[in-house]
Amino acid sequence: MKANIVTLPGDYIGPEIITQAVKVLQAVAEKYGHEFSFDERKLGGASIDAFGVPLTDETLAACNAADAVLMGSVGGPKWDAVEPARRPEKGLLALRKGMQVFANLRPCTIHPQLAGACPLRPDLISKPIDIMILRELTGDIYFGKRWRSEDRAAATDEMAYSVPEVERLARIGFEMAKKRRGKLCSVDKANVLECSRLWRETIERMSREYPEVEVSYMYVDNAAMQLILNPAQFDVMITGNLFGDILSDESAAIAGSLGMMPSASLGSTTRGLYEPIHGSAPDIAGRDIANPLGTILSGTLLLRHSLGLEAEAAAIEKAVSQVLDEGYRTGDIFSEGCIKVGCTQMGDLVAKRVLS
């Protein structure tokens, strides 16, 4: 297979972790006979420094012409004084909008080798945990109308969803549940919010098309509690932008380290945007100590969802597991008795296991 992948290293540790993810994808291409080309572009602060804007039209066009986009991280204190409309994070929002992605996938798994890093009691994670949180990206209160009174003493943010917005996300959720363990939990606040009542009604109607999927409903406050008390009960969780933002970060804490967590943003085509969920970590940038595994695992989502290469994705996941089995750890997941390695060495280790 030939594939064109745009890389957006971004800021601070972004270039370091992207380099390792590309290294591993190149190992996959070598082993399985694929031809991956990588087109590196600037995003966020790096783009501001070079072009004066966080995302150029040329970069967006390149992303939309690619088979997939792999991103590092954007933002940091260097650009704190930049006017809000040109901040690095605005580049990411514009990229998501320009690529027309609307579904954010956040896997939550606990690697057995890192169970000690999970803050939950051992009995709460005794069963395998494999959750996929599906968050809507383009609607909800983040994109609703905003108002602030002239005296700055009152403010309003509008929460809004339409049936088509919920339907297109739900379709992805149901199809994903069919391929996984056949369970979908829809999270809302339908006892209070009209927006959530529309959400639940839409999920209920669509569930009739998927009789093989077991559907459940939870209010968001209960879902937040159940993620702690019994995370193994969940398979696919589907929710809106605001609730998903909060729950997906909670799930990252369960996994033990932000550095291990990948994500994908998908639309109605196979082209997707893939990135780790952690930030740009300016405090450790340039020291070759960042954890690249979240970015490397984002590459598995890229292979699986954009290129349809399931065996290749599984090969990377197996390689990561082997490296962890052998005791190698970056500083954020290090514990006594393990072998501490840097960002580059971790990438080398995973790539070598892919090729073996």
Predicted regions and their residues:
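N-terminal glycine-rich phosphate/adenylate-binding segment common to multiple enzyme folds
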Residues: 49-156, 242-244
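Glycine-rich phosphate/nucleotide-binding loop
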Residues: 45-48, 227-328
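Extreme N-terminal starter segment of soluble prokaryotic enzymes
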Residues: 1-5
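N-terminal beta-loop-helix "entrance" segment that forms/cooperates
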Residues: 33-57, 225-227
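Buried hydrophobic packing segments
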Residues: 21, 25, 203, 295-306, ...
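Buried hydrophobic positions in well-ordered alpha/beta secondary-structure cores of metabolic enzymes
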Residues: 11-14, 67, 134, 173, ...
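Glycine-rich phosphate/pyrophosphate-binding loop and the adjoining helix
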Residues: 138-139, 143-180, 184-186, 190-192, ...
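Glycine-rich phosphate/diphosphate-binding loop of Rossmann-like nucleotide-binding domains
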Residues: 6-23, 28-29, 151-221, 233
